[in-house]
Amino acid sequence: MPAVACYVDTSAAVYGGAGALSLPASEINFSGVPPTTTSTTVNQPPPPQQWSPSLSAELYRIDRWGPPYFAVNSSGNVTVKPFGDATLPHQEIDLLKVVKKVSDSKSSSGLGLHLPVIIRFPDVLKHRLESLQSAFDFAVRTHGYGSHYQGVYPVKCNQDRYIVEDIVEFGSGFRFGLEAGSKPELLMAMSSLCKGSPDSLLVCNGFKDAEYISLAIIGRKLGLNTVIVIEQEEEVDMAIELSRKMGIRPVVGVRAKLRTKHSGHFGSTSGEKGKFGLTTTQILRVVRKLENFGMLDCLQLLHFHIGSQIPTTTLLSDGVAEASQVYCELTRLGAHMRVIDIGGGLGIDYDGSKSGDSDLSVGYTLEEYASAVVGTVMSVCDRKGVKSPVICSESVRAIVSHHSILVFEAVSSSSSASPPMPGSTLALDYLVDGLTDEVKGEYRSLTAAAMRGEYESCLMYSGMLKQRCVELFKDGCLGMEQLAAVDGLCELVSKALGVADGVCTYNVNLSVFTSIPDFWGIGQLFPIMPIHRLDQQPKARGILSDLTCDSDGKIDKFIGDESSLPLHELSGGEGYYLGMFLGGAYEEALGGVHNLFGGPSVVRVQQSDGPQSYAVTRAVPGPSSSDVLRVMHHEPELMFQTLKHRAEECDNDYTAGPLADMLAQSFNSTPYLVPGHATGSCGFSNGSGLVNGCREYFYGVDDGCNAAAVDAAAGEEEQWSYVCA
């Protein structure tokens, strides 16, 4: 069933003489308030408070989940603070201005990209990385810890080239590394770290075959600090055999299955029955095998993972303490242990509740997390007389979630409480004339109850009237116009009595399955809110329905335990833009092509000293219809030629040329809806009517912004622009 809801809007047309279905206000009181019989003084409610951006910030909770990167400015727009609390007022970036720059046509000095769009802020990414490092550095100094922190970024959460390259560049000063979980990810990480610090860790996780392990060993030959983490016992046999054949001594680690278990959704793979890692018995067998081959000195790292979004430092400390005991025991057994990798788990506050009782939040700060880890490892190792290890973490959500914003447009809305059609008693006469005597009785009972002010009876008779009329329609005894009229009357009753469902459906130019797959898959909630008009009070509540032909393609749960979202009424001719925040981890990597909706356009925005305070340093248009067809092994060129040939054969009012042009335009255009009349597309024409490779990069700069910022971001790459067909 299509997820884009279709409603019978009784205000849209007058049905064949049905006229209106509003009861005369002078005769029947549907106000929901019994008429007063005595003269009393009624206290008037206080005048409504004037709406302000600060009230919107409270309403959408951005003042809780947004700091230090997101806020609402005095213009009523969401603003981005690229440097967190250190951002100066003139450095803040107005998100609406960025969206306008990206989506406006090139003739209007825009980039001409279609929404939805992912806007990435590398300044925020850098600040997150530096904040994580600073938190651990502070904990190391405070506790007097005998080693240091050295993190890695698991590329599985977002393998985008520019995110990975940014992290390597931003983190090279403190030896920040990468983690891979497959052969393609390992190849990517090896290539990327050639530009990083030689001391950066390259942690090789996941299930492995001989080729995977060989690649990791080759990495050490190339001067990369690769560590093969043994997750299955047979992997150590391959590592021993291959390293001996290649004449290269590897560095290996073991992943331990801890007894400490995270009870939330994200801890489902933790504990003794977890998907990954080795039991205590298996770890001992790995140690013996390495010892038998004189390679126990190669065992240098212990890895574990309690689960993502660890809710409290109490649970964190329990897991780290258990793992630290394992680390100390491995040292006692003769391994040359050097690194303890605590995995992921550093959570973020999706709903602003700062609660340790929810999968959507955590009950600690970044500094408290780092202090708990460092203090616990130090306590166990000092007690056992073991040298403090390098502490590594794979804190992916905390690194990348904030730097990426998905912006999409609400293209229409459908209210379940439509206004009545104009008219009066003629419509009622038309309706009554078409009813059976039994149903006329229900109608008379309804009007009588309304006259007496018996409002519960009104609802009962209204429901009975509607049910009887539906039965008549199914039997072919009632016309569609009359059925619509009955719906309008019953809707009017519900609205007048204040019991009508006031939740609207806002149809959005988006695919939930492509852009927010975690919502569909596991019910993960992200902050969603309008990015503008926040100086105006939202008068509606709505759910969001996407473009896909799937009933699951909707967003009907929101942070704050809400089943609808406060929204503004749509204004004709003006776009209404919504943003999904804190979705920089996993969503792009997990998204599919359901209904052949491809990924959004992507732009990279950096802070600039120009008057607009930002510069668009990279833009990638979203895939065209041809692009997503190729993903499913179709050949758009052959499809186009087939349809073009059919057009030439058909005898119709159109010539073959215009038909072919229209077909080519459809292949080249975005799979998403295009506002207005423009259906242009991005790419380079090959002369056959189709566009090849709509994936080139655009380096642009806002009017008045510092062009040097763009040149620096472009580096040594050739600068491209794209054309719109």
From Swiss-Prot:
Identify which cofactors the protein needs according to its UniProt entry.
pyridoxal 5'-phosphate; Mg(2+)
On the tree of life, the source organism's domain of life is: Eukaryota
One of the GO BP terms on file = spermidine biosynthetic process
Keyword Disulfide bond in the entry? The reply is no
What's the EC number here? 4.1.1.19
> Which pathway does it operate in?
Amine and polyamine biosynthesis; agmatine biosynthesis; agmatine from L-arginine: step 1/1
Specify which residues bind substrate according to the UniProt entry for this protein: I340, D341, I342, G343, G344, G345, L346, G347, I348, D349, Y350
Q: Can you provide one Gene Ontology molecular function annotated for this UniProt record?
A: arginine decarboxylase activity
User: Keyword annotations for this protein?
Assistant: Decarboxylase, Lyase, Magnesium, Putrescine biosynthesis, Pyridoxal phosphate, Spermidine biosynthesis
Q: Which residues carry this modification: N6-(pyridoxal phosphate)lysine?
A: K156
Query: One Pfam family of this protein, by short name?
Result: Orn_Arg_deC_N
Q: Which InterPro entries match?
A: Ala_racemase/Decarboxylase_C (IPR009006), Arg_decrbxlase (IPR002985), De-COase2_CS (IPR022657), De-COase2_N (IPR022644), De-COase2_pyr-phos_BS (IPR022653), Orn/DAP/Arg_de-COase (IPR000183), PLP-binding_barrel (IPR029066)
Q: Which reaction does it catalyse?
A: L-arginine + H(+) = agmatine + CO2
NCBIfam families in the cross-refs: PRK05354.1, speA
Q: Which family does it belong to?
A: Belongs to the Orn/Lys/Arg decarboxylase class-II family. SpeA subfamily.
Protein's name according to its UniProt entry: Arginine decarboxylase
Gene name of this polypeptide? ADC
